[in-house]
Amino acid sequence: MANLDLSKYGITGVTEIVHNPSYDVLFAEETKPGLEGFEKGQVTNMGAVNVMTGVYTGRSPKDKFFVKDETSENTVWWTSEEYKNDNKPVDAKCWAAVKDLATKELSNKRLFVVDAFCGANENSRLKLRFIMEVAWQAHFVTNMFIRPTAEELANFGEPDFVIMNASKAKVENYKELGLNSETAVVFNLTEKIQVILNTWYGGEMKKGMFSYMNYLLPLNGMASMHCSANTDKEGKSSAIFFGLSGTGKTTLSTDPKRLLIGDDEHGWDDEGVFNFEGGCYAKVINLDKESEPDIWNAIKRDALLENCTVNAEGEINFADKSVTENTRVSYPIYHIENIVKPVSKGPHAKQVIFLSADAFGVLPPVSILNAEQTKYYFLSGFTAKLAGTERGITEPTPTFSACFGAAFLSLHPTKYGEELVKKMEKTGAKAYLVNTGWNGTGKRISIKDTRGIIDAILDGSIDKAPTKVMPYFDFVVPTELPGVDPKILDPRDTYECACQWEEKAKDLAGRFIKNFAKFTGNEAGKALVAAGPKL
């Protein structure tokens, strides 16, 4: 299969193409003697290889751009003064320059080419071609995307999208090209190419394709979602879990009683819910065997660790965040035992769960949402972190990320809300807002109680529970649930005085109202204001 012609992309003089290498070949290539710098993988005593990604230990949203042309001009949700996002425009001249840099970097070299699928549903999946000069980057995409069978590879044909990773090349004249730095991640929706320059972070390839799926699917009547998903063991219904980083998406969807569809990116079409990916990309900071056995056990040969501290004996220090807090592992999804096989897809979702880690201590541990509230809280995409300030006081900082994934939305957020609710209405799915954060005790809600809440949602007992309505937010909350401490279900009961909750609730309600103003530029957004908090 090494007779691939890369000259049509402008890559010439290639000395050898290693096409869809096996895991054994990848292991040998990324650990072979003589590799230097960030190309070098270190074998750990768990069997997985660890690599370092240099100065970029996460995505670089400031360096993400789309070429503005006839294809994209009226479809992409462009950044604007009043509402900044990561979809920044560049012109044809800039594109020609960055593409030229990438093709020059990749020409006259020995290259890795990985052909893979994005999307587990045959009728909507994309054929991707990744071109790179670094072995472990080929390993990363082999883990993260859907690996074609030998027969599918033989009949792969032309890809739908091409990703050129030229992480060794720098954009020195970035200022005159209208870029942000020497690093650039640029998409051309007409040529269907993504170019990556001067960042080694693996996640740029993963999230790049998520941004593209987020562009295509809603325009074709499918929901595209930043969520994890699982199904019951009988495969009768799915549940989807939306949530920003650190809210428990991966942890809560990995459930011994259920089968995992995927942990991060999914579509929902007329047949059901499907994974975009063939692997998982889990955070491993402070990873502990007891509390996250599935992820722990997935770290073995063929898994790829990023930016972990590993000593000369190959021992991994998961608590060390000296390089970054965003230490990660990618592994093929079959490293997790409880998964949907052979294809990562499931039936229509019956439960849609929005996870928020509310550091303000206001949101109830679980609220049952109506259709309008579903749209409102989906567009709000709220969570909050506790950030240390200079005097050691820990203050909550709110994050509002539209659709629980604003960084990856290529179209206007209301489009994703529309598609999601359309699918929910068609299948009779219900939405729940689950707070995995803090309450009046100053402690985080226990994972035991949160799991009890998720169980009650999934087995339907929450729909039979007695309820009451919370002030300001009009949330319907259960007053008792099996296996859950009843004293936490109304957050007011966790404070010495309900007045303390009221004060915080007014503050948070005001923040929701202020944030939502940015969606009221169109009729769909205006109509939802009434579903939000009221002061």
From Swiss-Prot:
EC number(s) given by UniProt: 4.1.1.49
SUPFAM superfamilies in the record: PEP carboxykinase N-terminal domain (SSF68923), PEP carboxykinase-like (SSF53795)
UniProt-annotated binding residues for ATP: 207, 226, 243-251, 292, 328, 444-445, 450
Pathway(s) served: Carbohydrate biosynthesis; gluconeogenesis
Residue ranges of coiled coil: none
Subcellular location: Cytoplasm
Pfam family, one: PEPCK_ATP
Family: Belongs to the phosphoenolpyruvate carboxykinase (ATP) family.
Listed name of the protein: Phosphoenolpyruvate carboxykinase (ATP)
Species the sequence originates in: Bacteroides thetaiotaomicron (strain ATCC 29148 / DSM 2079 / JCM 5827 / CCUG 10774 / NCTC 10582 / VPI-5482 / E50)
This protein's encoding gene: pckA
